[in-house]
Amino acid sequence: AALPPGDAAAAQGGSNGVGPNLYGIVGRKSGTVEGFTYSKANQDSGVMWTPQVLDVYLENPKKFMPGTKMSFAGLKKPQERADLIAYLETLKD
């Protein structure tokens, strides 16, 4: 479930792609990565990406945030979400 090693979306200062750069996502406010065009729903959500919030979001992004541009259907298995969140937590200074 994790992003491949060396993925630009995970690198500090990496480029935005289909989604925003994920470096430092845990603890960051939704819709705030410079240079990425977010949906209005994401920009206006006020969501803070904590591990708990990411768990709910990653299960079903469109249910969690109606109007999101996220095309990913979600991770139904709790362990897959936990593994991905643990990985995302390593992407920080």
Swiss-Prot record:
This is Cytochrome c. Residues 1-21 are annotated as: Disordered. GO terms for cellular component: mitochondrial intermembrane space. Residues 1-13 have a biased composition (Low complexity). It is found in: Mitochondrion intermembrane space. Keywords: Electron transport, Heme, Iron, Metal-binding, Mitochondrion, Respiratory chain, Transport. Heme c binds at M70. PANTHER family: CYTOCHROME C. PROSITE patterns: CYTC. Belongs to the cytochrome c family. GO terms for molecular function: electron transfer activity; heme binding; metal ion binding. Electron carrier protein. The oxidized form of the cytochrome c heme group can accept an electron from the heme group of the cytochrome c1 subunit of cytochrome reductase. Cytochrome c then transfers this electron to the cytochrome oxidase complex, the final protein carrier in the mitochondrial electron-transport chain. InterPro entries: Cyt_c-like_dom, Cyt_c-like_dom_sf, Cyt_c_1A/1B. Binds 1 heme c group covalently per subunit. It comes from Trypanosoma brucei brucei. Its main location: mitochondrion.
